[in-house]
Curated annotation (Swiss-Prot):
Function comment: Acts as a component of the MCM2-7 complex (MCM complex) which is the replicative helicase essential for 'once per cell cycle' DNA replication initiation and elongation in eukaryotic cells. Core component of CDC45-MCM-GINS (CMG) helicase, the molecular machine that unwinds template DNA during replication, and around which the replisome is built.
Keyword line: Acetylation, ATP-binding, Cell cycle, Chromosome, DNA replication, DNA-binding, Glycoprotein, Helicase, Hydrolase, Isopeptide bond, Nucleotide-binding, Nucleus, Phosphoprotein, Ubl conjugation
EC primary class: hydrolase
Signal peptide: none
Protein name, per record: DNA replication licensing factor MCM7
GO terms for biological process, alphabetical: cell population proliferation; cellular response to epidermal growth factor stimulus; cellular response to xenobiotic stimulus; DNA damage response; DNA replication; DNA replication initiation; DNA strand elongation involved in DNA replication; double-strand break repair via break-induced replication
Chain positions of cross-link Glycyl lysine isopeptide (Lys-Gly) (interchain with G-Cter in SUMO2): K15, K28
Family: Belongs to the MCM family.
Disulfide linkage: none
More about this protein: Early fractionation of eukaryotic MCM proteins yielded a variety of dimeric, trimeric and tetrameric complexes with unclear biological significance. Specifically a MCM467 subcomplex is shown to have in vitro helicase activity which is inhibited by the MCM2 subunit. The MCM2-7 hexamer is the proposed physiological active complex.
Post-translational modification as stated in the protein's UniProt record: O-glycosylated (O-GlcNAcylated), in a cell cycle-dependent manner. Ubiquitinated by ECS(LRR1) E3 ubiquitin-protein ligase complex when forks converge following formation of DNA interstrand cross-links. During mitosis, ubiquitinated by TRAIP when forks converge following formation of DNA interstrand cross-links. Short ubiquitin chains on MCM7 promote recruitment of DNA glycosylase NEIL3. If the interstrand cross-link cannot be cleaved by NEIL3, the ubiquitin chains continue to grow on MCM7, promoting the unloading of the CMG helicase complex by the VCP/p97 ATPase.
Length: 719
């Protein structure tokens, strides 16, 4: 391979920066990098991002050279920009910082006192890093496909690579010294020391000509005002779970972030990082201990937040007309719910509840008191009813989620752990699963197998949406604004209808009341249902997809984008519905007391109805909650309660819905002979019956001459 002429390469770079242009909408030339150089010269911009796709248009060979030897070419580009900046400077910089004033002052003093023929010593020259007031980063070419962390090996050292993963840990942003400036206590000369490695040995003896001649032995003192610092942050990145081969542990990589790239990513973010893969050069005793092995890191040039499993950058984007047509049909609510885990047979109401969990309600913060909008759901049931499959599907569908199991999780693993930082040696916090799932969903399987001490760590998260830490002198509060989806088995493996609810579930009331919906999925023998389920499972097993039907499930990417659009809406509950909701809640409390209901109905139940109602309004992309939303929320609440009552609650509803509707209407009459049609329908719908069932019961009892409905269908009168 022939040696490169880097002087010629620098000229190519200069030519590219000056001459590259793109045509705008009007057909005029827009000098992309020329305009940025003007802003850099006037301190209106700090970072210059060089898109290598632009370089490829001009010189494809130069792109290959940059990708192969990125560190050298980054310096080459920076030098070229530094030389070009004076040409683009049209006026004096207004916003000057301390270092500007310091350098200007030194240059002015030097011009006054210096002999024209005198040459400065190398240590006394201003280093390029001190004079350079901008940052330069490369944006990888589109042909450079993202790689898995475990595929970045020794052959990638020094090259520009793009990797994807999840951020597990982020350090505080601290100042990193780039140039150290010293002043001599004897002769007053200034010495500059550019720093390239993570550690450096400060200079002690003055190297100036005066001190050397006089042998005065002047000592150097660090002058922080004249030194240059840059923002520095360390980040740990781990492979996605789907990138890890079977039986392997997820690999992680250290990413060192500087300047404008800091504070972009948070723990739990899915990111794509373009950077230079380099070894860490240890010095002194550490090198002796380390031997021939070397740790590696990625010097970040560009960090992009990603959606969980999409190739494009984060952000939902507008839906096309065709996509909106797919969603906006008459039964879109049922269609969206059925698109959740279409391979799993049945569980229609459970899927509707999970859809509302993904959309979420609206957060309220009246005078600093926070009322959560996230919906928490617990699925409890017999083994083999697809609870874990539903959880894993939600984990894949949610843009941001964490999946964990009860026995494999400790309280610290869920909340936060105190670790010692490898660089600074300070104690730092590392977020657990609930912190990493902030603004997302945390799925906890085998919830009943968790130790009681670990389960109590979740109480604060489920209501206050925060985690308060008081460990090793660190007192802080972390955000954990996530919905919790838990799956658990009953206490004795299967649900025993002969035992009470408390004996079957064995979870504390404080925890159960924090779940908006607690759903019991039982595996009851039913010939027709079992036959359909068996046919469904065998088809899925043979063809690895759901059986053909008239219904076509929506694509996962489309659902994710639609849910992201729904979450932007902030619907409110109108005053006209306030009385209706309070009346429904009071009725639920009365019924629970009268029937000695095993489930606990508290003020949290009312908040759960409001959350479910606002989630339904979000799903319809409207700004005001309507009566139908409240009715559906109450219906889901009633269905979840009925599932907990087991056979007792199911007999009346499943065998004779008409009889239950008749009893409900008779309750409303209470001494009189007639009742308003709308009032009766509203009460029956709020108890979980559909308008069609109400109509069927009405017709049935009218034929039996038990009651009569007037011609305008506004009143029901008992005969």
């Amino acid at each position: 391979m022939a040696l490169k002429d880097y002087a010629l390469e620098k000229e190519k770079v200069k030519k590219f920066l000056q001459e590259f242009y793109q045509d705008d909408e009007l057909g005029k030339k827009q000098f992309k990098y020329g305009n940025q150089l003007v802003r850099l010269a006037h301190r209106e911009q700090v970072a210059l991002y060089v898109d290598l796709d632009d370089v490829a248009e001009d010189d494809p060979e130069l792109v290959d050279s940059i990708c192969e030897n990125a560190r050298r070419y980054a310096k080459l580009f920076a030098d070229a920009v530094q030389e070009l900046l004076p040409q683009y400077k049209e006026r004096e910089v207004v916003n000057k910082d301390v270092l500007d004033v310091y350098i200007e002052h030194r240059l002015m003093m030097e011009q006054r006192s210096r002999d024209p023929g005198m040459v400065r010593s190398p240590q006394n020259q201003y280093p390029a890093e001190l004079m350079r007031r901008f940052e330069l980063y490369f944006q990888g070419p589109s042909s450079n496909k993202p790689r898995v962390i475990r595929e970045v090996r020794a052959d990638s050292v020094g090259k520009l690579v793009t990797v994807r993963g999840i951020v597990t840990r982020v350090s505080e942003v601290k100042p990193k010294m780039v140039v150290a400036t010293y002043t001599c206590d004897q002769c007053g000369a200034e010495t500059y020391q550019p720093i390239q490695s993570p550690t450096f040995m400060p200079l002690i003896m003055c190297p100036s000509q005066e001190c050397q001649t006089n042998r005065s032995g002047g000592r150097l003192y660090l002058q922080t005002r004249g030194s240059r610092f840059i923002k520095f942050q360390e980040m740990k990145m781990q492979e996605h779970s789907d990138q890890v081969p079977v039986g392997n542990i997820p690999r992680s990589i250290t990413v060192l972030v500087e300047g404008e790239n800091t504070r972009i990513a948070q723990p739990g973010d899915h990111v794509s990082v373009t950077g230079i893969f380099l070894p860490i050069l240890r010095t002194g005793f550490r090198q002796v201990v380390q031997g021939l092995l070397s740790e590696t890191y990625l010097e970040a040039h560009r960090i992009v937040k990603m959606n969980k499993s999409e190739d494009d950058e984060s952000g939902a984007g507008e839906l096309t007309r065709e996509e909106l047509r797919q969603i906006a049909e008459e039964d879109f609510y049922e269609k969206l719910a059925a698109s959740i885990a279409p391979e799993i047979y049945g569980h229609e109401d459970v899927k509707k509840a999970l859809l509302l969990l993904l959309v979420g309600g609206v957060d309220q913060s009246p005078r600093g008191m926070k009322i959560r909008g996230n919906i928490n759901i617990c699925l409890m049931g017999d083994p083999g009813v697809a609870k874990s499959q539903l959880l894993s599907y939600i984990d894949r569908l949610a843009p941001r989620s964490q999946y964990t199991t009860g026995r494999g999780s400790s309280g610290v693993g869920l909340t936060a752990a105190v670790l010692r930082d490898s660089v600074s040696g300070e104690l730092t916090l590392e977020g657990g699963a609930l912190v990493l799932a902030d603004q997302g969903v945390c799925c906890i399987d085998e919830f009943d197998k968790m130790a009681e001490a670990d389960r109590t760590a979740i109480h604060e998260v489920m209501e206050q949406q925060t985690i308060s830490i008081a460990k090793a002198g660190i007192l802080t509060t972390l955000n954990a604004r996530c919905s919790i989806l838990a799956a658990a088995n009953p206490a004795y493996g299967r649900y025993n209808p002969r035992r009470s609810l408390e004996q079957n579930i064995q979870l504390p009331a404080a925890l159960l009341s924090r779940f908006d919906l607690l759903w019991l999925i039982q595996d009851r023998p039913d010939r027709d249902n079992d036959l359909r389920l068996a046919q469904h499972i065998t088809y899925v097993h043979q063809h690895s997809r759901q059986p053909p039907s008239q219904f076509e499930p929506l694509d996962m990417k489309l659902m994710r984008r639609y849910i992201a659009m729904c979450r932007e809406k902030q619907p409110m509950v109108p005053e006209s519905l306030a009385d209706y909701i309070t009346a429904a809640y009071v009725e639920m409390r009365r019924e629970a007391w009268a029937s000695k209901d095993a489930t606990y109905t508290s003020a949290r139940t009312l908040l759960a109805i409001l959350r479910l109602s606002t989630a339904l309004a979000r799903l319809r992309m409207v700004d005001v909650v309507e009566k139908e939303d409240v009715n559906e929320a109450i219906r889901l609440m009633e269905m979840s309660k009925d599932s907990l009552l087991g056979d007792k609650g199911q007999t009346a509803r499943t065998q004779r819905p008409a009889d239950v509707i008749f009893a409900t209407v008779r309750e409303l009459v209470s001494g009189g002979r007639s009742v308003r049609f709308s009032e009766a329908e509203q009460r029956c719908v709020s108890r979980g019956f559909t308008p069609a069932q109400f109509q069927a019961a009405l017709d049935e009892y009218e034929e039996l001459n038990v009651w009569q409905v007037n011609a305008s269908r506004t009143r029901i009168t008992f005969v």
